[in-house]
């Protein structure tokens, strides 16, 4: 019979998603989850690519926004915080990559810190995007500018988003530690004693309810009414000005929604609402790893969106280059005229 009170009896095999939930069948034996060496190195190369792109891209985004003090909008302040969250997370990717090869060799402190940064990145991202959706909803649907133009209030909202993200992520910092199971590589894992399985389910369900589902519903509500208002009023220029915001939200959902859906399925399986088998466990573990990598990719995609869609971002970047003599002022002036004529009305002033 599976003994959940003795962690030494578990066979993790490096599976970071294992919850220790015992199966109902007493004759059931733990599944052996295998990881191919090729897959490990593909993951490492992917992490390295995301790290480099995120480090360069988000640093440029922060530089451009911080340089543009005069034309900085409320949305820009939110996107600045979004870039900071992605940058902090990117700094942990080399550690995650190394753990794919040798297991978790970095000790309990780094286990807590990098797990905290990963969760804070996710929660702050969706909370900030929810705040942007509310800001755009007030500005377009209700034509409210008093709240959206007070930047000092926006700073307090951002601080609140970071604080709530820290609270939602705090259990990972408190309970995760470096653990060395028998006959397996060390892992960074939540350890809560005999009730690890039960509490891990609680720690999984509550944060994702308040840190993902609720903000997602807020975004769907706000952007639904915002789009309805834009199309109803035939506000074509304002709609074009919202392209960056919509693209950022869409990319976030495409990157993180699959992981959360697989995680929800895994939760149903762990709580025996879906029958668990070795084959399903292997499929879920592979899906979790693949969709988590997709989520990691999100940290480097926003700067690419700004570069291709955000005219203000391109102009701000060229302005910095011109200040340092890397491009001519004539070229900057021509680019500014082109940008102005192609989008003469800028409702959100976002990047």
Swiss-Prot record:
InterPro entries registered for this protein in UniProt: CCR1-9-like (IPR050119), Chemokine_CXCR1 (IPR001355), Chemokine_CXCR_1/2 (IPR000174), GPCR_Rhodpsn (IPR000276), GPCR_Rhodpsn_7TM (IPR017452)
Gene Ontology terms for molecular function: C-C chemokine binding; C-C chemokine receptor activity; C-X-C chemokine receptor activity; interleukin-8 binding
Protein's recorded name: C-X-C chemokine receptor type 1
Transmembrane annotation, as ranges: 42-62, 77-97, 113-133, 155-175, 205-225, 244-264, 290-310
Disulfide bonds: 111-188
GO annotations of cellular component type: external side of plasma membrane
Pfam families named in the record: 7tm_1
Glycosylation sites: 3, 182, 194
Membrane topology: Multi-pass membrane protein
Function: Receptor to interleukin-8, which is a powerful neutrophils chemotactic factor. Binding of IL-8 to the receptor causes activation of neutrophils. This response is mediated via a G-protein that activates a phosphatidylinositol-calcium second messenger system.
Ranges of the Extracellular topological domain: 1-41, 98-112, 176-204, 265-289
UniProt main location, coarse: membrane
Subcellular location: Cell membrane
Matches recorded under Gene3D superfamilies: Rhodopsin 7-helix transmembrane proteins
